[in-house]
Every structure is written in C-alpha cells, then in structure tokens.
Amino acid sequence: MTAERIVEGVKESLGIMSDDTDINNQIRGKAIAVMNYINNGGGNITPENATEYEIQAIALGVNDLLNQNGSEFSEGFKAMAAQIQLRGGENDKI
C-alpha cells in the first residue's frame, strides 16, 4: 500500500470524488499529520502496512481537521487512535 492508496481511502471514506491536485495534496498533508499523531502516541502505521481500520481512523482525523472542531480531535477519533496506539508495533493487525 502506498501513500496514494491512503489518500484514496481517506477520500473514499469522506465521500470526496474530486481528483484535483490541490485537494489531493491537502488530503495527503492532513493524512500524514494524522498518521504521525497516531504514531507519536505509540502506533506503528506506515503506508505499506496500513489496515482498513487504520485508514478509517486516519480519515476520521482528517475529517476533524477539515471541519476544525475547536482545537481537538473528536472523541471517536481519539478512541480509534488509542486502540491503534495500545496495539503499538504488534503484527496482529485488526
């Protein structure tokens, strides 16, 4: 899986149909930021090993950033991120 597959997965999850370069770049940047946020808390997501669950978590975080819900991520994203972070580098992915 590549970074582009994560971008496409996030766009699909959010219902974004456009293939505009600027939109893709914005989604890519936010997806990388969310992935780094999860990884900095103990997660182990890479474009090569991202599961569907992890892509959905990234999409939820990207949605929060796009909607700028105050200064925090949503409770749903925090719960999904915590599950990924607790699992850490384990190979048994969801």
Which functions belong to the PLM regions below?
Residues M1-I94:
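Divalent metal-cofactor coordination and adjacent catalytic microenvironments
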